[in-house]
Amino acid sequence: RGAESDHVLVLVDGVRMGSATAGLPALQDLPIDQIDRVEIVRGPRSSLWGSEAIGGVIQVFTRRNTGKVRPNVRIGVGSDSTREASAGNGGGIGRGWFGADVAYTRTDGFNACRGTGGDAANPFGAGCFTDEPDRDGYRNTSANLRGGYSFTDTLTLEANALRADGKSEFDGSYTNRSETVQQVLGTKLRYTPSDKVNLLLSLGRNDDKSDYFHDDVQSGYFQTRRYVASAQGDFTVAANQLLTAGIDWQDDRVESTTLFAVTRRDNLAGFVEYQGRFGAHQLQASVRNDDN
């Protein structure tokens, strides 16, 4: 649809994720073993989710263990000295449920680039402008905790914590290794007094940090810390007609070896959306106001 990767909002269990400086998250570091499903909304959704969603929304849901308590273990190997292992436990107990998982992935990789730093034939170099004939690997360590409890049939509390540490090696004259940290914390309180009313209060925090190195010497880093809160109500006003109203707030803070004129911003917004289905036709109308 002509949008770029930094035009898409990424949510992990409802919490906004991503770097305020790069404009997009490190999706490659999210642990696949701990993802239950991914939902994608294509097209502009800024009126509901804000300016980060002008190209769409990607919502990642981690696994929710509500059945019988059951441990799990998985081990795998592959080419390029790839090995991975994961273990976890979770399930439902009475009116509550819990889940805990850890995972580790490592591959020694291969030589990512055969470049030159400059010679008589090409004094400016070529490729990645350096000659590092080594294997460039990747490592990822992650942990995910989540749980919930239903106080009544209409009132439910959930909480989740996800952390993923990644290390990528590559060839480059300025940087040849990056280390990333992705952390998501969230809690939700849901109240559903009837099948026509759904109220949700959410709090969350996201930490995104990227460190860059050249031959084990740090060359720079970027860190974003984001706090979010929202209150939303969904109301079924008639058959196949839904009215959504809410407010959301976020506070972004940036630290880096690069000097920025502004290192903190906050945004308070209110929104209303109507969705209706009439036979083969759909109608959607929404409005949002942001104070940034």
Q: What do the predicted segments below correspond to?
A:
Residues 4, 64-66, 91-95, 153, ...:
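A generic beta-sheet turn/junction motif
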Residues 46-47, 59, 66-68, 74-76, ...:
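Periplasmic-side early beta-strands and strand-to-turn transitions of outer-membrane beta-barrels
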Residues 2-4, 12-14, 42, 62-64:
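Flexible glycine-/small-residue-rich
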Residues 1-3, 33, 41, 80, ...:
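A short, compositionally biased micro-patch
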Residues 7, 15-42:
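Short acidic/polar hinge/loop motifs at secondary-structure boundaries
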Residues 21-24, 70-72, 111-114, 170-173, ...:
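Short acidic, glycine/proline-rich loop/turn micro-motifs
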Residues 148-165, 180-292:
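Face-selective signature of the C-terminal outer-membrane beta-barrel domain
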